């Protein structure tokens, strides 16, 4: 058995799985989404290149309306100004500056780092030792970001006492709707991140522009996104290796969890010049979930000859050696990559 990680083709990635039930959908092109108040004059819409799950409409005076297709609408009100008096009840008002954010959608933290906006985050859904983003871990160790409980069990008292201006959740919050309701009762606005529902990897990346609006750093967000686009384009110009890749994790009951071929991760593998071993997996099923569960024997039959196997260690626990991987299943030792 090869001992070197590169020779083994085993990479430990820090990728968070975001899945949940679909919420009600509303059209972002409806005139009602732009004409939201007699006191506001619509100016323009943000031009998005890849993202389809959100929209930003700008109004005179610096007001901006964020529409998350499967979640709701949020009016960002400039500092020193007031929200219109005739807004629809479904529009959540976010008064700038938005501070002491309770960030539960862990995958969003990297966007705040790229915007140099960690100072806007006051609370984390993860503990310091669970963070794979060094800047977040360090901020928590310094006491600048506090742990305020998970999505299903937040520390309401701490969140409210520190003046939390916004809770950014992932779609797991819909498994515990009572938590969302309680936060809203306590006057903490809740925004649900749907970036994981973008079919294009660059669509997920473009959500940095939504967070740029929230923290008042739109130009920085646009620049950060364009840098990611250039990086993707550079990779796309590289020679395609055709190397086969499997991405998976093993649950506590021994079942193997892999991504549907329509998920963004298989698409990223293809964009990087590789080939996902489960080329058409789950395409015939109409479901919002990006995951498919199978028995180890089925996984072995499909992936045993893969050039690379990528273990998603953040879903269970972090692995640091091939030996720890083999403890998950002795059958893995028979894989060519191992």
PLM features: residue spans?
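Sec-dependent N-terminal signal peptides of Gram-positive bacterial secreted proteins and lipoproteins
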Residues: 5-24
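Extracytoplasmic/secreted envelope proteins and their assembly/folding machinery
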Residues: 88, 95-98, 105-112, 156, ...
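Bacterial Sec-exported substrate-binding components of ABC uptake systems
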Residues: 21-109, 220-247
